[in-house]
Amino acid sequence: MAAALPPAIFLMGPTAAGKTDLALALARVLPCDLISVDSALVYRGMDIGTAKPDKAVLAEFPHALIDIRDPAESYSAAEFRADALAAMAESAARGRIPLLVGGTMLYYKALLEGLADMPSADPVVRAELEARAAVEGWEALHRELAEVDPQSAARIHPNDPQRLTRALEVYRVSGMSMSEHRLRQAAGNPEGGTSASGQLPYTVAQLAIAPAQRQILHERIAQRFQAMLEQGFVEEVEALRSRSDLHAGLPSIRAVGYRQVWEYLDGKLSREEMVERGIIATRQLAKRQFTWLRGWGDLQWLDSLACDNLPRTLKYLESVSILK
Protein backbone atom coordinates (compact mmCIF):
# COMPACT_ATOMS: atom_id res chain seq x y z
CA MET A 1 0.00 0.00 0.00
CA ALA A 2 1.43 3.36 -1.03
CA ALA A 3 2.33 5.75 1.76
CA ALA A 4 0.07 8.77 2.17
CA LEU A 5 1.42 11.98 0.72
CA PRO A 6 2.35 14.70 3.21
CA PRO A 7 -0.15 17.57 3.59
CA ALA A 8 0.21 21.12 2.28
CA ILE A 9 -2.07 24.15 2.21
CA PHE A 10 -2.43 26.75 -0.55
CA LEU A 11 -4.00 30.04 0.55
CA MET A 12 -4.78 32.08 -2.56
CA GLY A 13 -6.79 35.17 -3.40
CA PRO A 14 -6.65 38.62 -4.98
CA THR A 15 -4.52 41.42 -3.62
CA ALA A 16 -5.82 43.17 -0.48
CA ALA A 17 -8.16 40.26 0.32
CA GLY A 18 -6.71 39.37 3.73
CA LYS A 19 -4.56 36.35 2.87
CA THR A 20 -1.75 37.27 5.26
CA ASP A 21 -4.05 37.80 8.25
CA LEU A 22 -5.63 34.38 7.80
CA ALA A 23 -2.24 32.73 7.23
CA LEU A 24 -0.94 34.19 10.49
CA ALA A 25 -4.06 33.05 12.32
CA LEU A 26 -3.50 29.52 11.02
CA ALA A 27 0.19 29.63 11.94
CA ARG A 28 -0.77 30.46 15.53
CA VAL A 29 -2.76 27.25 15.96
CA LEU A 30 -1.21 24.78 13.50
CA PRO A 31 2.32 23.39 13.03
CA CYS A 32 2.75 25.36 9.79
CA ASP A 33 5.72 26.82 7.95
CA LEU A 34 4.80 29.88 5.88
CA ILE A 35 6.05 30.06 2.30
CA SER A 36 5.42 33.22 0.27
CA VAL A 37 3.94 32.88 -3.22
CA ASP A 38 4.41 36.46 -4.39
CA SER A 39 6.60 37.66 -7.25
CA ALA A 40 7.17 41.07 -5.61
CA LEU A 41 7.90 39.95 -2.05
CA VAL A 42 11.06 38.18 -3.23
CA TYR A 43 12.77 41.57 -3.57
CA ARG A 44 14.77 43.18 -0.79
CA GLY A 45 14.12 46.87 -0.10
CA MET A 46 10.62 46.70 -1.56
CA ASP A 47 8.55 46.57 1.60
CA ILE A 48 5.84 49.23 1.68
CA GLY A 49 4.54 48.94 -1.87
CA THR A 50 4.38 45.15 -1.68
CA ALA A 51 2.52 45.13 1.68
CA LYS A 52 5.32 42.93 3.00
CA PRO A 53 4.77 41.71 6.56
CA ASP A 54 6.74 43.92 8.93
CA LYS A 55 9.91 42.86 10.76
CA ALA A 56 8.08 42.01 13.98
CA VAL A 57 5.70 39.68 12.14
CA LEU A 58 8.51 38.06 10.17
CA ALA A 59 10.50 37.56 13.38
CA GLU A 60 7.59 35.73 14.99
CA PHE A 61 6.42 33.96 11.83
CA PRO A 62 9.30 33.53 9.36
CA HIS A 63 8.27 33.32 5.70
CA ALA A 64 10.34 31.41 3.17
CA LEU A 65 10.94 33.12 -0.21
CA ILE A 66 10.74 36.70 1.07
CA ASP A 67 13.76 39.00 0.51
CA ILE A 68 15.69 36.46 -1.56
CA ARG A 69 16.52 38.65 -4.57
CA ASP A 70 17.97 42.09 -5.21
CA PRO A 71 15.67 44.35 -7.26
CA ALA A 72 18.25 44.34 -10.07
CA GLU A 73 17.71 40.60 -10.52
CA SER A 74 14.89 38.70 -12.21
CA TYR A 75 13.03 35.77 -10.67
CA SER A 76 11.15 33.27 -12.79
CA ALA A 77 8.41 30.74 -12.17
CA ALA A 78 10.97 27.99 -12.74
CA GLU A 79 13.18 29.41 -9.99
CA PHE A 80 10.17 29.77 -7.71
CA ARG A 81 9.15 26.16 -8.29
CA ALA A 82 12.60 24.89 -7.34
CA ASP A 83 12.80 27.13 -4.26
CA ALA A 84 9.27 26.34 -3.11
CA LEU A 85 9.72 22.58 -3.51
CA ALA A 86 12.88 22.79 -1.41
CA ALA A 87 11.12 24.81 1.30
CA MET A 88 8.15 22.43 1.29
CA ALA A 89 10.40 19.38 1.57
CA GLU A 90 12.27 20.92 4.48
CA SER A 91 8.99 21.69 6.26
CA ALA A 92 7.55 18.22 5.66
CA ALA A 93 10.77 16.58 6.86
CA ARG A 94 10.24 18.28 10.22
CA GLY A 95 6.72 16.90 10.42
CA ARG A 96 5.17 20.30 9.76
CA ILE A 97 2.66 21.55 7.18
CA PRO A 98 3.85 23.85 4.37
CA LEU A 99 1.40 26.76 4.16
CA LEU A 100 1.85 28.62 0.89
CA VAL A 101 0.28 32.06 0.86
CA GLY A 102 0.19 34.71 -1.86
CA GLY A 103 -1.46 35.85 -5.05
CA THR A 104 0.97 35.04 -7.87
CA MET A 105 -1.23 32.46 -9.55
CA LEU A 106 1.37 31.45 -12.15
CA TYR A 107 3.57 30.22 -9.31
CA TYR A 108 0.81 27.97 -7.95
CA LYS A 109 0.20 26.63 -11.45
CA ALA A 110 3.92 25.89 -11.84
CA LEU A 111 3.89 23.94 -8.57
CA LEU A 112 0.79 21.92 -9.37
CA GLU A 113 1.46 21.17 -13.03
CA GLY A 114 5.17 21.60 -13.58
CA LEU A 115 6.52 23.73 -16.41
CA ALA A 116 5.72 22.80 -19.99
CA ASP A 117 8.53 22.55 -22.52
CA MET A 118 6.80 25.11 -24.74
CA PRO A 119 3.50 26.46 -23.42
CA SER A 120 0.39 26.91 -25.49
CA ALA A 121 -1.16 30.34 -25.94
CA ASP A 122 -2.64 31.92 -22.83
CA PRO A 123 -5.46 34.35 -23.72
CA VAL A 124 -5.31 36.12 -20.34
CA VAL A 125 -1.57 36.83 -20.57
CA ARG A 126 -1.83 37.76 -24.25
CA ALA A 127 -4.67 40.21 -23.59
CA GLU A 128 -2.65 41.81 -20.80
CA LEU A 129 0.39 42.25 -23.06
CA GLU A 130 -1.70 43.71 -25.88
CA ALA A 131 -3.40 46.11 -23.47
CA ARG A 132 -0.01 47.27 -22.20
CA ALA A 133 1.23 47.75 -25.76
CA ALA A 134 -1.79 49.94 -26.52
CA VAL A 135 -0.80 52.23 -23.65
CA GLU A 136 3.01 52.03 -23.59
CA GLY A 137 3.85 51.04 -27.16
CA TRP A 138 5.57 47.95 -28.54
CA GLU A 139 8.99 49.49 -27.92
CA ALA A 140 8.35 49.24 -24.18
CA LEU A 141 7.48 45.56 -24.48
CA HIS A 142 10.56 44.98 -26.62
CA ARG A 143 12.71 46.50 -23.85
CA GLU A 144 11.04 44.13 -21.40
CA LEU A 145 11.86 41.18 -23.66
CA ALA A 146 15.47 42.33 -23.84
CA GLU A 147 15.64 42.08 -20.04
CA VAL A 148 14.32 38.52 -19.79
CA ASP A 149 15.37 37.04 -23.16
CA PRO A 150 18.04 39.12 -24.91
CA GLN A 151 18.61 36.46 -27.58
CA SER A 152 14.99 36.55 -28.71
CA ALA A 153 14.94 40.34 -28.48
CA ALA A 154 17.91 40.48 -30.85
CA ARG A 155 15.97 38.38 -33.39
CA ILE A 156 12.57 40.06 -33.06
CA HIS A 157 11.94 43.56 -34.38
CA PRO A 158 9.97 45.93 -32.11
CA ASN A 159 7.44 46.33 -34.93
CA ASP A 160 6.69 42.59 -35.02
CA PRO A 161 3.93 42.43 -32.39
CA GLN A 162 2.96 38.81 -33.07
CA ARG A 163 6.40 37.34 -32.39
CA LEU A 164 7.09 39.83 -29.61
CA THR A 165 3.86 38.91 -27.83
CA ARG A 166 4.59 35.21 -28.19
CA ALA A 167 8.10 35.50 -26.75
CA LEU A 168 6.87 37.42 -23.71
CA GLU A 169 3.89 35.09 -23.36
CA VAL A 170 6.20 32.05 -23.22
CA TYR A 171 8.25 33.67 -20.46
CA ARG A 172 5.21 34.76 -18.44
CA VAL A 173 3.46 31.39 -18.67
CA SER A 174 6.42 29.05 -18.19
CA GLY A 175 8.94 31.12 -16.26
CA MET A 176 11.60 30.36 -18.87
CA SER A 177 12.64 32.33 -21.92
CA MET A 178 11.91 31.06 -25.41
CA SER A 179 15.66 30.82 -25.97
CA GLU A 180 16.04 28.56 -22.94
CA HIS A 181 13.17 26.38 -24.14
CA ARG A 182 14.86 25.98 -27.53
CA LEU A 183 18.20 25.09 -25.95
CA ARG A 184 16.55 22.40 -23.85
CA GLN A 185 14.67 21.01 -26.83
CA ALA A 186 17.85 20.95 -28.91
CA ALA A 187 19.66 19.09 -26.14
CA GLY A 188 16.77 16.67 -25.71
CA ASN A 189 16.51 17.62 -22.04
CA PRO A 190 13.01 17.08 -20.68
CA GLU A 191 13.80 18.52 -17.25
CA GLY A 192 11.04 20.82 -16.11
CA GLY A 193 8.44 19.35 -18.47
CA THR A 194 5.00 18.16 -17.50
CA SER A 195 5.95 14.54 -16.94
CA ALA A 196 5.30 12.51 -13.82
CA SER A 197 8.14 14.44 -12.19
CA GLY A 198 6.04 17.57 -12.59
CA GLN A 199 3.37 16.25 -10.19
CA LEU A 200 3.38 17.82 -6.74
CA PRO A 201 4.09 15.09 -4.15
CA TYR A 202 1.67 16.46 -1.54
CA THR A 203 -1.98 16.25 -0.61
CA VAL A 204 -2.98 19.88 -1.11
CA ALA A 205 -5.92 21.74 0.41
CA GLN A 206 -6.63 24.79 -1.75
CA LEU A 207 -8.25 27.83 -0.14
CA ALA A 208 -9.18 31.17 -1.67
CA ILE A 209 -10.22 34.28 0.24
CA ALA A 210 -11.89 37.42 -1.13
CA PRO A 211 -14.73 39.79 -0.23
CA ALA A 212 -18.09 38.52 -1.45
CA GLN A 213 -18.70 41.89 -3.15
CA ARG A 214 -16.15 43.19 -5.65
CA GLN A 215 -16.82 46.82 -4.66
CA ILE A 216 -15.57 46.10 -1.15
CA LEU A 217 -12.29 44.84 -2.57
CA HIS A 218 -11.98 47.99 -4.69
CA GLU A 219 -12.46 50.12 -1.58
CA ARG A 220 -9.84 48.12 0.31
CA ILE A 221 -7.39 48.51 -2.57
CA ALA A 222 -7.84 52.30 -2.60
CA GLN A 223 -7.51 52.53 1.18
CA ARG A 224 -4.38 50.40 1.20
CA PHE A 225 -2.71 52.40 -1.56
CA GLN A 226 -3.35 55.63 0.36
CA ALA A 227 -1.99 54.00 3.52
CA MET A 228 1.16 52.95 1.65
CA LEU A 229 1.74 56.54 0.58
CA GLU A 230 1.35 57.70 4.19
CA GLN A 231 3.85 55.04 5.29
CA GLY A 232 6.52 56.35 2.89
CA PHE A 233 5.97 54.50 -0.39
CA VAL A 234 7.23 57.43 -2.48
CA GLU A 235 10.39 57.64 -0.37
CA GLU A 236 10.91 53.90 -0.79
CA VAL A 237 10.82 54.26 -4.57
CA GLU A 238 13.10 57.31 -4.37
CA ALA A 239 15.67 55.12 -2.63
CA LEU A 240 15.41 52.57 -5.44
CA ARG A 241 15.74 55.30 -8.10
CA SER A 242 18.95 56.50 -6.47
CA ARG A 243 20.62 53.25 -7.50
CA SER A 244 22.35 53.42 -10.87
CA ASP A 245 21.63 49.76 -11.65
CA LEU A 246 17.83 50.02 -11.42
CA HIS A 247 15.51 51.26 -14.14
CA ALA A 248 11.85 51.14 -15.14
CA GLY A 249 12.30 48.13 -17.43
CA LEU A 250 13.20 45.69 -14.66
CA PRO A 251 10.58 43.18 -13.44
CA SER A 252 10.88 44.53 -9.89
CA ILE A 253 10.16 48.13 -10.90
CA ARG A 254 7.29 47.04 -13.15
CA ALA A 255 5.49 45.71 -10.07
CA VAL A 256 2.08 47.27 -9.48
CA GLY A 257 2.40 50.60 -7.72
CA TYR A 258 6.16 50.87 -8.16
CA ARG A 259 5.89 51.65 -11.85
CA GLN A 260 3.35 54.42 -11.21
CA VAL A 261 5.40 56.01 -8.41
CA TRP A 262 8.54 55.74 -10.57
CA GLU A 263 6.77 57.59 -13.40
CA TYR A 264 5.62 60.24 -10.91
CA LEU A 265 9.20 60.76 -9.74
CA ASP A 266 10.28 60.94 -13.39
CA GLY A 267 7.85 63.83 -13.84
CA LYS A 268 5.63 61.88 -16.23
CA LEU A 269 2.63 61.89 -13.87
CA SER A 270 1.20 64.35 -11.40
CA ARG A 271 0.68 63.08 -7.87
CA GLU A 272 -3.06 62.79 -8.49
CA GLU A 273 -2.45 60.82 -11.69
CA MET A 274 0.02 58.57 -9.89
CA VAL A 275 -2.49 57.76 -7.16
CA GLU A 276 -5.30 57.17 -9.65
CA ARG A 277 -3.21 54.95 -11.92
CA GLY A 278 -1.71 53.06 -9.00
CA ILE A 279 -5.15 52.20 -7.69
CA ILE A 280 -6.43 51.28 -11.16
CA ALA A 281 -3.39 49.06 -11.80
CA THR A 282 -3.97 47.28 -8.49
CA ARG A 283 -7.63 46.73 -9.36
CA GLN A 284 -6.58 45.31 -12.73
CA LEU A 285 -4.19 42.96 -10.94
CA ALA A 286 -7.05 41.78 -8.72
CA LYS A 287 -9.21 41.22 -11.80
CA ARG A 288 -6.50 39.04 -13.38
CA GLN A 289 -6.18 37.07 -10.15
CA PHE A 290 -9.95 36.48 -10.12
CA THR A 291 -9.72 35.31 -13.74
CA TRP A 292 -7.18 32.67 -12.72
CA LEU A 293 -9.22 31.63 -9.70
CA ARG A 294 -12.48 31.27 -11.64
CA GLY A 295 -10.85 28.54 -13.70
CA TRP A 296 -9.27 26.84 -10.69
CA GLY A 297 -10.62 23.49 -9.60
CA ASP A 298 -11.27 22.19 -6.09
CA LEU A 299 -11.23 25.53 -4.26
CA GLN A 300 -12.70 26.25 -0.84
CA TRP A 301 -13.81 29.91 -0.87
CA LEU A 302 -13.86 32.17 2.18
CA ASP A 303 -15.37 35.64 2.57
CA SER A 304 -12.78 38.18 3.72
CA LEU A 305 -15.35 39.91 5.93
CA ALA A 306 -16.60 36.79 7.71
CA CYS A 307 -15.80 36.56 11.42
CA ASP A 308 -15.45 32.77 11.47
CA ASN A 309 -12.83 32.16 8.77
CA LEU A 310 -10.37 30.49 11.14
CA PRO A 311 -12.77 27.87 12.57
CA ARG A 312 -14.30 27.31 9.11
CA THR A 313 -10.84 26.75 7.66
CA LEU A 314 -9.84 24.35 10.42
CA LYS A 315 -13.07 22.39 9.93
CA TYR A 316 -12.45 22.20 6.18
CA LEU A 317 -8.85 21.04 6.68
CA GLU A 318 -10.12 18.26 8.94
CA SER A 319 -12.73 17.25 6.35
CA VAL A 320 -10.09 16.78 3.64
CA SER A 321 -7.72 14.95 6.02
CA ILE A 322 -5.07 17.67 6.10
CA LEU A 323 -5.50 17.69 9.87
CA LYS A 324 -5.76 14.40 11.70
Curated annotation (Swiss-Prot):
Substrate binds at residues 15-20. Its EC number is 2.5.1.75. It catalyses: adenosine(37) in tRNA + dimethylallyl diphosphate = N(6)-dimethylallyladenosine(37) in tRNA + diphosphate. It is an enzyme of class 2 (transferase). Keywords: ATP-binding, Magnesium, Nucleotide-binding, Transferase, tRNA processing. One of its GO terms (biological process) is tRNA modification. GO terms for molecular function: ATP binding; tRNA dimethylallyltransferase activity. Catalyzes the transfer of a dimethylallyl group onto the adenine at position 37 in tRNAs that read codons beginning with uridine, leading to the formation of N6-(dimethylallyl)adenosine (i(6)A). Monomer. This is tRNA dimethylallyltransferase. It comes from Ectopseudomonas mendocina (strain ymp).
